[in-house]
Amino acid sequence: MLSRSDLLTLLTINFIVVTKGAERISEVSARFTLDAMPGKQMAIDADLNAGLINQAQAQTRRKDVASEADFYGAMDGASKFVRGDAIAGMMILAINLIGGVCIGIFKYNLSADAAFQQYVLMTIGDGLVAQIPSLLLSTAAAIIVTRVSDNGDIAHDVRNQLLASPSVLYTATGIMFVLAVVPGMPHLPFLLFSALLGFTGWRMSKQPLAAEAEEKSLETLTRTITETSEQQVSWETIPLIEPISLSLGYKLVALVDKAQGNPLTQRIRGVRQVISDGNGVLLPEIRIRENFRLKPSQYAIFINGIKADEADIPADKLMALPSSETYGEIDGVQGNDPAYGMPVTWIQAAQKAKALNMGYQVIDSASVIATHVNKIVRSYIPDLFNYDDITQLHNRLSSTAPRLAEDLSAALNYSQLLKVYRALLTEGVSLRDIVTIATVLVASSTVTKDHILLAADVRLALRRSITHPFVRKQELTVYTLNNELENLLTNVVNQAQQGGKVMLDSVPVDPNMLNQFQSTMPQVKEQMKAAGKDPVLLVPPQLRPLLARYARLFAPGLHVLSYNEVPDELELKIMGALM
């Protein structure tokens, strides 16, 4: 009966006490760990923004948080296996018991008492052999899930706690010795274990505990001093504002995963290359980082540390954009293109072939984000162009025309050049032909230092490249100003210049006239687009800076040219007049 009671005790402890408790603890730990994950991520971002940690340390801490969540999630599932193992052991025990008795009675013709005695004894022996490893497994799982997390590994914690005091080893020594002298027990193994534990306890009692405590105290003090010195505020710890950055919600982070081919990184690199080539200046690197303050499928674009735009897109879907050849409607979530606001449908990846067959343009999430970044960055290029870019631009000029570069540096200082270059970039004029631009600036700087007039002279020299995108078969279709409006604006500009020095793009205008521009300029733009023409407004040279500024405000995409910027070989076709 001793064996039976032992088996029942092991079953009770294993199933009711150990596995039940470990299962409950693992469930609670997993839930609490996952619930606390956003807060931990926000704390890491706060420390990073405050300069308490650097980017590498923040990345390491994020990985630790993710690993902890994965661990407790895995242990939650593992506890189900452990509990299932205990239940399976009980079921196997019952099957062996009932099956053995039945075999003894019906196959071997034993009496019920003899069969019960024989097969119960065999079942208990098998059950003990199976339940002891199961109990050890359950206990190990319980120890892991109930452990308080710190910076040490579990083996280190167990060793420190078991060997924390010699009295623990002395107690174990006494128990081993008592077992060694019990009749019927294996004397030699227990005596050896007793001697080993006693010797270990004796050696530990001889160690200077005071020295160990002093060493730990010194180590703690050193670590505190080191961390304090590393976190002192200095110029190096103050984070610099990044010119361009892209923040991603955690569901979009997979778009920059190396295992998936870095689709977003590749497209952003392409955007930077295209914009740099088109404008003749090197665009700053576009930094991509995760931001747990954003919604899971949200991203935000920052220019010089300020949020320029943001959007929320389904991370696991494709964007189906209707075209002129589209027929029918495809099932999906209706929405708008983040960059241009066009109506689109978000579809599953499995619907891609169907959407293409129906005439839709299918765009993946990485391309959607890259297109949005391209649109935003292009509108901020003048703000991103700075003094260092002038240096790099002039270095390129020096490699092809060193004397011209020297004359340009002598004619205009960096502050004046920055205004001219930014004025050109604001109106979409590329700086690739830096030799022509520098030649004009050197010649015109002897007459004026006004950046608006200097930019106008550069535009005149680059008139063919400026008008080229709008020309169709040597014909340029334009809108002009109504004669009455042109005379009125000319008088306003002349009176402003007589009253003092006024920038041509900042001449004060009557509010009623501004309201008129606000309504008529978009109309001109839409009418020309509806006719399949590029929106172009042709105006007198002295009015072009002012009207170009209003066009950027009221009708982005409406290009304003002056009469003298139209090459002589082109034929003008006047489509209408701006009233």
Curated annotation (Swiss-Prot):
Membrane topology label: Multi-pass membrane protein
* Compartment(s): Cell inner membrane
Protein keywords: Cell inner membrane, Cell membrane, Membrane, Transmembrane, Transmembrane helix
The record's listing under InterPro entries reads: FHIPEP_1, FHIPEP_3, FHIPEP_4, FHIPEP_CS, T3SS_FHIPEP
What Pfam families does UniProt report for this protein, alphabetically? FHIPEP
Membrane-crossing ranges are 86-106, 124-144, 177-197
PROSITE patterns reported for this sequence: FHIPEP (PS00994)
* GO BP, sorted A to Z: bacterial-type flagellum assembly; protein secretion
Give the family from UniProt: Belongs to the FHIPEP (flagella/HR/invasion proteins export pore) family.
- Annotated PANTHER family: FLAGELLAR BIOSYNTHESIS PROTEIN FLHA-RELATED, FLAGELLAR EXPORT PROTEIN, MEMBRANE FLHA SUBUNIT-RELATED
Q: What is this protein called?
A: Putative truncated flagellar export/assembly protein LfhA
Provide the species name: Escherichia coli (strain K12)
